[in-house]
Amino acid sequence: MAFASLLHHIWNHAVDCAEQLTWWQTIVSFIIFCIMCSWLPGNGEMRAPFVGYRWPFEPTFWVRMRFIFQSLGMMTEGYSKFKDSMFKITTNDADWLVLSQRYLDDLQSLPAERLSHTDALVTMWGSSHSPFALLNKSDLSSRALRDVVAPNYAKDLDSLVDELRYSLEHDIDIQDDWKPIDALELSSKLVLRISQRILIGWPMSRDQELLECAQGYADAATVVQFALKLLPRQIRPLVYPLLPQAWATKSWIRRCDKILAKEMQRRQVLEKSDPVYEKPKDLLQGMVDLEPSRPVDKLGHDFLVQALISRMAPVVTMAQTLVDLALHPEDIEELRDEVLQVIGPDGAGLGNLRQSFTKLDKMDSVLRESARFTPLSMMTMHRRVQDAKGITLHDGVHLPRGTHVAFPAYHIGRDPKLVSGADIYDGLRWYRKDLGEAQENEAPKHRFVTPDSNYLTFGSGKYVCPGRFIAEHMLKLMMTAVLLRYEFKWPPGVPVPEQQYRHVFAYPSKTTLLIKRRKDGDQIL
C-alpha cells in the first residue's frame, strides 16, 4: 500500500508539473525525449554501415523522421554504395539491415521458428501498438486465406464477373464525355467489391453495413499506422490510446463482430435444415472451421485485418498500371486487342476465365513492369531473426537474434546490371523477353506473379505471398473491364508525376486521369 501511495503521489506531482508547462516548454521537452530515445540501441550487435546521416552528429531521431519523407534518397545512397553487401537504415520502427540479393538463397526457405516474417511485418506496418499487432497474436485469418480461400476461389470466377458488373453499374459514374476520374478511387471501389465477394461470398459481398465496416476500418487503421510511424516506438503505447482513429478501429471491429456472428447463425441454420447445403469456401467459414473453439462473435478483427491486407496491393497496383498506361498510350491498344482476341467479340472467353487469363501475356507483362517500376513497397521480404543462436550466412556473416532484415526490391528492379534499360518503363518488356527465350510449348517465365531474384514484389521462397494469384485474377478482371468499357488518357498539360515514397510505401501523388465510355464497350463485360 505504501508503494502504491508513493506512485500515486509521484503521478499527481507529474500531472501538476505538466499543467504548468508552456507550449514552448512542452515542445522542447518532447524534442529532448526524442533525442534520449534515439540513444537507445537498435540492432547494435549487427555490424554494418549506416546510411542516411547527412553529417556525423545528426541526431538519430531526426534521421528517423527524415526516413518517413526521404526514404527513397536514403535507400538509393545505401544501394549505390553497398549493393553487393549490406547496410543499415534507422527508422522509428527498428534498425533495418538491408541485404544484397546474393543472400536470398540463405534466407528464403528458413522456417518461421528461425526467421519470422510475421514479427517483421508487424514492425514494418506500425509496431505492436497498432491494429496490425493482431497478426502476432492470431494467424487464423492468414491460415484461412492460405488453406481455404486460395485453393478454392478460382473455381467460381464467374461470380467475380457478376460482382464486377454490379460495381461498374452502381459505384462508377463514367459518361460519354471525357471526365476526370481518380484512378486510385476507381480501383479502390472495384477492389472493395470483388475482394468481399472472394472473402465472404454472396449475398454478404453486397451487405452495405459490412462494406462500410471494411472501408471504415481500412481508413482508420491506415491513419493510425502512419501516425505511429512519426513517433519513437517508446512513446507509441502512450499515444496509441489517445488517437481517435484507434478508437474508431475498435468500433468498426465491434460492428463487424455482430455482422459476422449473424451471418454464421444464418449458415448454421441452413446447414441443419437444408440437406443440399454446401459450406462456402470463404474466409469466414474457413476461420470457423479451422478454429471451432473461437466464438463466432469474435472474428471481426481477424476478418477486417485480412480484408485490408488483401486489398492494399491490388488497389495501388491497379491505379499505378492505369497511370503508366495513360503515360504510355501505345500499349493500350495492344492490350485491348489481346483482350478482344482472348475473350472474343461475343464474350465466349468469359466462360472459362481461369484459362483465358493465362493467355493474357501482354497484360501480364504490363502488370509486372508497373510492379517493377513502382513496387508497392520499396523493401520486401522483411524478416526478424528468432533463432536464439542467430543465423550465419554463406560467407560467414552472422545475424544475431532480433535482427530485422529486408531486401531492396525497388533498387534491385531498377539496377541496370540486372534489368536492361531499368530506368525506362517498357510495358511489353517481359512479353518480348519471353518470346525470345521460350522453348516450344514452354509457359512464359516472367509472369506478374512469378518471383525471381530480380523481381521481389511478392517476396521469394517459402513465404512468397499466398494471395498473389488472387491479386492477379482481380487485376486482370478489372483491367479487362476497363479496357473494354472505357477510353482513358493522361490530362494534357499535366506534368508527369515524380515517383514518391512515404516510409517504404509507394505514394502515388497524381492519379487523376481523363476517362470516358467506349461505344458499345459494355456489350462484352
From Swiss-Prot:
The keyword Membrane applies. It is found in: Membrane. Heme binds at residue 465. Pfam families: p450 (PF00067). Glycans are attached at residue 136. Disulfide bonds: none annotated. It is a single-pass membrane protein. GO terms for biological process: secondary metabolic process. The keyword Transcription does not apply. It is an enzyme of class 1 (oxidoreductase). It comes from the Eukaryota. Belongs to the cytochrome P450 family. GO terms for molecular function: heme binding; iron ion binding; monooxygenase activity; oxidoreductase activity, acting on paired donors, with incorporation or reduction of molecular oxygen. Induction: Expression is down-regulated when the stress-activated mitogen-activated protein kinase (sakA) is deleted. PANTHER family: CYTOCHROME P450. This is Cytochrome P450 monooxygenase ltmJ. Its cofactor is heme. Its EC number is 1.-.-.-. Disruption phenotype: Does not produce lolitremanes but accumulates both simple and O-prenylated paspalanes. It comes from Epichloe festucae var. lolii. InterPro entries: Cyt_P450, Cyt_P450_E_grp-I, Cyt_P450_sf.
